Amino acid sequence: MHPDLSPHLHTDECNQLITLLKQCHKEHNVLKFFGTCNDMDRAMRECLRKEYQTKRERSKAHAEEMRRRLKEQPKEHP
């Protein structure tokens, strides 16, 4: 099962691989069940995995920055 393959959610590189996989599935209606498109599927999944890891790292860095900024703010209590 793949994540949402909408183009606005992915990089150009992954979108190109997604398009190639969909095209392969259209061209090989029956052979896709026998592994004809598996290489493209693996490449697409690897690209999506890298994209996911990048997003996780960026989110983690952002969260750490937010925590640091919250700790540095002076506490203003009346």
Curated annotation (Swiss-Prot):
Keywords, ordered alphabetically: Disulfide bond, Mitochondrion
Disordered: region residues: 52-78
A cellular-component GO term for this protein: mitochondrion
A Pfam family reported for this protein in Swiss-Prot or TrEMBL: Cmc1
Location of the protein in the cell: Mitochondrion
Location of the CHCH domain: 11-55
Name listed for the protein in its UniProt record: COX assembly mitochondrial protein 2 homolog
Cystines in this chain: 14-47, 24-37
Record organism: Danio rerio (Zebrafish)
Motif (Cx9C motif 2): 37-47
Purpose of the protein: May be involved in cytochrome c oxidase biogenesis.
Motif Cx9C motif 1: where in chain: 14-24
Similarity section: Belongs to the CMC family.
UniProt xrefs under InterPro entries: Cyt_c_biogenesis_Cmc1-like
